[in-house]
């Protein structure tokens, strides 16, 4: 009889279960309290109950745990310095969506060489999240598929659904089940309506199929996530200007949704020129000083060193520099946070 299935499967490996990984790297009571408390603070900011600004900042992607921990340690000092005005959360992205092909992130390929040791990647991701949370720094990530979140979602304070997946039904269903607030990016073309539709969908109850923590395929029924919000990330042109934010708020108002959103300084808003994040910051700071209450948060890409580098076989990587999107350096990061904190002063 002719085979009709798995004709294009080149390799199958066993995967550790979320329960097994959590037993290996358990959440302490102090970390559990930290995650719970940071989620509540973020929810209050997104609801307009707290006038402070949510700041999701960090490397475009995590590839080196030592550099990530050095960044997290320095970020914790900034958290303490600006805590009266900013709720700073570290961007800890382990999965990278690709328009065509490329390195897909630490979880998929932790060795950066196409060996795809996913079990090791999941272990590194969970270990890092525990260490960063133990420092007192909340973590943020993008949820790219329906499985890997089961391994790390208990350590995440804020989640994102990316521009390429906001329109996806399964991602909207997953967001309705997540225990943290979730931001939906506008489409890569700049369309914010799909993000509003995603917010509406994620607030509803859904049923979907997914593995549970023990790897058993399960039917999940969700109660809905009331903390979905738009991330303005630009598109063919930037959409961080006051008129863009007003237009997005009009759409939110049309559907009786909270008129609070997050502005991404990178991606389409900086037109892929990382230093323009500082220009976007200046504009957003002025909008806040002018009385904007719609801007509840911002996102920015920064690391220890400026720019980006390519992975070249046989050549060592530059420590503390991105291997995906170019980032601001640490000195610019401190300036950016100082400017944001000063602008938010006007809300008090």
Curated annotation (Swiss-Prot):
Which reaction equations make up its catalytic activity? D-erythrose 4-phosphate + phosphoenolpyruvate + H2O = 7-phospho-2-dehydro-3-deoxy-D-arabino-heptonate + phosphate
Query: Which SUPFAM superfamilies does its entry note?
Result: Aldolase
Drop me one GO molecular function for this one. Answer: 3-deoxy-7-phosphoheptulonate synthase activity
The answer to keyword Amino-acid biosynthesis applying to this record is yes
Enzyme Commission number(s) from the entry: 2.5.1.54
Q: List the disulfide bonds.
A: none
Listed GO biological process terms: amino acid biosynthetic process; aromatic amino acid family biosynthetic process; chorismate biosynthetic process
Quote the function comment for this protein: Stereospecific condensation of phosphoenolpyruvate (PEP) and D-erythrose-4-phosphate (E4P) giving rise to 3-deoxy-D-arabino-heptulosonate-7-phosphate (DAHP).
Q: What is this protein called?
A: Phospho-2-dehydro-3-deoxyheptonate aldolase, Trp-sensitive
Originating organism: Salmonella typhimurium (strain LT2 / SGSC1412 / ATCC 700720)
